[in-house]
Regions:
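Short, glycine-/Ser/Thr-/acidic-enriched flexible segments
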Residues: 48, 106, 138
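A short interface-forming secondary-structure element
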Residues: 100-114
Length: 139
C-alpha cells in the first residue's frame, strides 16, 4: 500500500500514495484511521513533519502514533529496498539501547544496509532505541 503511488508517477511516490489512500474508502477503517494510514505512508520518502505542521488534523497522541508507525515502515521498507526479499528469517533482540535485527541471507545487502542506516535516526528519535541491522549468512 505504501508504494501504490508509484503506479501513478515515480516522482513523489509518498504524496501520490497519500492521495490514493485519502480518496479511497477502505472497508473496516474509519475516516480518521484512513487518514492515519495516509500520513504514515506519505512520509516514507521525505522528512517527517513537525507536529506544528499537522496539529490541525491530529491530536498529539495520534501524531506520535503516526511517527512511530512511519519509523517502523521506513525500516521495514529499507530491509527490502531492492524488492527481492533477500532475507529469509529475522531475529530481533533488545539489549540496552540497541535493537538488533538479524536477518539470514546469502545475498549482498549493501543497498538495504545503507538505506537502513539513513532511516535509523528517525526510528531512534521516535522510540528511544537504536536499530542495528546485522546479516547472518546461511546456506
Amino acid at each position: 500500500l505504501h508504494n501504490c503511488g508509484s503506479f501513478l508517477n515515480l516522482n513523489d511516490i509518498g504524496e501520490n500514495s497519500y492521495k490514493i489512500v485519502t480518496s479511497t474508502e477502505i472497508i473496516g477503517l474509519s475516516h480518521q484511521e484512513r487518514m492515519i494510514v495516509a500520513y504514515v505512508i506519505r512520509y516514507t520518502t521525505g522528512d517527517f513533519p513537525e507536529y506544528s505542521e499537522i496539529k490541525n488534523e491530529f491530536s498529539r497522541e495520534e501524531y506520535i502514533k503516526i511517527a512511530k508507525l512511519n519509523a517502523i515502515l521506513c525500516l521495514a521498507d529499507a530491509m527490502d529496498r531492492s524488492h527481492q526479499q533477500k532475507f529469509t528469517n529475522f531475529t530481533v533482540r533488545k539489549r540496552g539501547y540497541d535493537l538488533t535485527i538479524t536477518g539470514q541471507t546469502l545475498y549482498d545487502i549493501t543497498l538495504e544496509h545503507g538505506i537502513f542506516i539513513q532511516k535509523s535516526p528517525f526510528f531512534e528519535e521516535a522510540f528511544g532505541i537504536r536499530p542495528v541491522l546485522r546479516q547472518k549468512k546461511c546456506l
